[in-house]
Amino acid sequence: MEKIALLVDKVHQGKIFSEKYYERMRKLGELKIYDADSYDDKDYVRNFVAGSTVIVTTWGSPVIDKDILDACPDLKAVIHAAGSIKPVISDEFIARRIRITNSAVAIGEGVAETALGFAISACKGFYQLNRDTSSGIWRENAFDTVIDFYDINVGVISGGYVGRHMVKLLKNFHVNIYMYDPILTAEQISAIGAEKVSLEELLTKCDVVSVHAPSIPETDNMLHKGNLCLMKDKAVLINTARGSVINEQDLIDELKTGRLFACIDVTNPEPPVEDNELRRLDNVILTPHIAGTVSNGLKRIALHACEELERLVGGEKMRTEVNLDELARLA
């Protein structure tokens, strides 16, 4: 039987987990649940994890450093019930080659669903038309200005978990799907369900562009004035990834021409300053980073963590196990 330590503070326990998921874990081993509101007492943390073979972490969990690793010499894996693993791993963790999995796929489902909602709503003009009707304007010619989500070109930037789920959702519609990803081959992208194109071609031909690239040095300011100008008039740009991927001032300058419509869930920094023009432009929908799994959707993470634990105990490959050799290109 595994010795499972849920190294998750009480606040996050209440948001992510419930007794249903604890019972599922208890079927796989002896479960210890962290009984504190913070991780300030290092001795308490170390004693809590001592002897564990599996540790479950989440946002805010302490770094799995040498002290923690020395306290659990038989540690097999860390199940990270959150996105990026970088906040919880240490050089010692990497050196010891401990297995680790994250919940990016569970979070990514919510992100992709939000991006799809943005796409359909923006094409149909929901935001502008609602603003007009609220102001007493009834647009008789609205049929001539909105776009059906049919027989249009949709571009997905990056073929990670979110991008893949976005394509999966898009395949339910009669749209042409294109993907830019510098790592994946044309065959791999075809297997996902899209056609591989260059970034420039994607921006040029697509009516909707949805950004799902990770925040890494290679993607910093990936979209800028030199390529945003390639986008079609009346195209929709959606960013539910990271604010750093788009040069914000260049985007604002392009939006001020009125050519594009943007749905922005992430900025750099967050929140944007009060006088940021994204807050006031009529052709922008700006939301406070809600695309990821939130509220009741956090239970997806608990489910995924349980499933990964079951795979680990069953000797199967964990679905979202992270290759520590590829950390540099991961968010």
Language-model features: locations:
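An N-terminal-biased, well-structured beta-alpha scaffold segment characteristic
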Residues: 1-101, 224
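Rossmann-like adenosine-cofactor binding region
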Residues: 63-66, 183-277
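Rossmann-like dinucleotide-binding domain for NAD(H)/NADP(H)
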Residues: 100-101, 234-331
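Phosphate-binding beta-alpha-beta segment of Rossmann-like dinucleotide-binding domains, i.e.
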Residues: 103-153, 168
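Glycine-rich Rossmann-fold phosphate-binding loop(s) that bind the pyrophosphate
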Residues: 159-160
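N-terminal Rossmann-fold NAD(P) dinucleotide-binding loop
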Residues: 163-164
